[in-house]
């Protein structure tokens, strides 16, 4: 992940995590405070429509969609959305549709409705979608890798048939 931190300058007091495109070029980075400063994140003033961590994604394996970079570190072959939404116009969405027929969703429990909207979108493209429970934790990043893997193994397959039931159970 090539994680670093800044002691001085515009990003002082922040952990910096770079993202590299498939050619190995720096495409973006996030800078998160490790103090109790506000704002929590201070990111570069460039377009963030990138596939974060693209260089290290194995597109031959299922990918895991998570909200943040620290979640992705725990999850493994994961794409951080840098939020809790996914647009059809985004590079992440386009790569998933082109390359990855199976997706695991693991957004924070407080984003359940947004997660179901993403699942609905992915199902419209005939992808196989599993929902990983994050209940009992703030997010994937607060789990151990072992706990996340256990939850991933027990993930619920969401299809057109049970999608509505899942929405009603929120």
Residue ranges, per PLM feature:
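TOPRIM metal-binding catalytic domain and adjacent DNA-binding surface shared by DnaG-type primases
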Residues: 1-16, 20-23, 57-58, 97, ...
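Phosphate-handling DNA/RNA-contact segment within nucleic-acid enzymes
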Residues: 6-102
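Short, surface-exposed amphipathic charged segments that create phosphate/polyanion-binding patches used
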Residues: 15, 94-100, 139-154
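Acidic beta-strand-to-loop metal/phosphate-binding motif
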Residues: 65, 100-114, 132-133
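Phosphate- and divalent-cation-binding pockets in alpha/beta enzyme and binding domains
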Residues: 74-75, 114, 139-140
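Short, acidic/turn-prone active-site loops that include or flank metal/cofactor-
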Residues: 82-90, 108-111, 134-136
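Short, aromatic/basic amphipathic alpha-helical patches
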Residues: 114-126
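A generic structural motif
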Residues: 128-139
């Amino acid at each position: 992940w090539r994680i670093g931190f800044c002691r001085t300058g515009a990003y002082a007091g922040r952990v910096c995590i770079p993202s590299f495109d498939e050619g190995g070029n720096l495409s973006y980075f996030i800078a998160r405070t490790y103090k109790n400063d506000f704002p929590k994140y201070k990111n570069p003033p460039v377009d963030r429509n990138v596939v974060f961590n693209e260089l290290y994604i194995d597109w031959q394996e299922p990918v895991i969609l998570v909200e943040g970079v620290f979640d992705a570190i725990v999850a493994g072959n994961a794409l951080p959305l840098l939020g809790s939404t996914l647009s059809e116009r985004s590079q992440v969405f386009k790569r998933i549709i082109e390359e990855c027929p199976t997706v695991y969703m693991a957004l924070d429990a407080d984003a359940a409705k947004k997660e179901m909207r993403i699942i609905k979108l992915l199902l419209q493209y005939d992808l196989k979608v599993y929902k990983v429970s994050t209940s009992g934790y703030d997010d994937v990043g607060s789990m151990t890798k072992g706990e996340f893997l256990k939850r991933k193994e027990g993930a619920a397959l969401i299809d057109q048939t049970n999608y509505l039931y899942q929405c009603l159970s929120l």
